[in-house]
């Protein structure tokens, strides 16, 4: 840590941060000679989605070259070229390595990530105001969490989830359009469909 501080003091490493109105940091950058080597959210995790536009704006304004933590800036590299995940040609498909955290971002719809054919990580869009899952990646190798939204359909959900699929605390009355394959737990508790099934099971036991 001591040698790291010396590099900062000597200007060899520059540290920048995106802060809220109370001065609390939510995104931290490490830059060396105009090249961005780190972009971290809290606890060294991927930054929250709501900060992505600000992150991309800072990188563009400062003209930093993105060397590491590419996915944390919502970019990715393909065939040596850098692409913006929010502005990717829709006639192409790609894979994305890393988790995507869109939770608690005041979203009413997902950014269109439907051309992500495989996400090597987990996808979290919980705690928003989503009424649809349109725009979801096609396959998730980790977990998929869309709980605590206002979903009344699972239309647009990934075709395959290798981890768990959590759609609890929504307004689902049917489970049509759910992923074709869920390899782990499928949690749809605290939805009207769960209550309907409970009542139906009670009726079946009485007959």
Locate predicted features:
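Leucine-rich repeat
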Residues: 116-117, 139, 160, 181
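Structural alpha-beta junctions
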Residues: 56-67, 120, 183-185, 203-207
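Extracellular beta-strand solenoid repeats
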Residues: 101, 118-120, 124, 134, ...
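LRR N-terminal entry segment and analogous cap-like coil->beta motifs
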Residues: 82-125, 140-141, 146
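Catalytic-core elements of nucleic-acid end-processing and repair enzymes
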Residues: 1-95
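Leucine-rich solenoid repeat scaffolds
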Residues: 164-207
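Canonical leucine-rich repeat
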Residues: 85-88, 110-113, 133-136, 154-157, ...
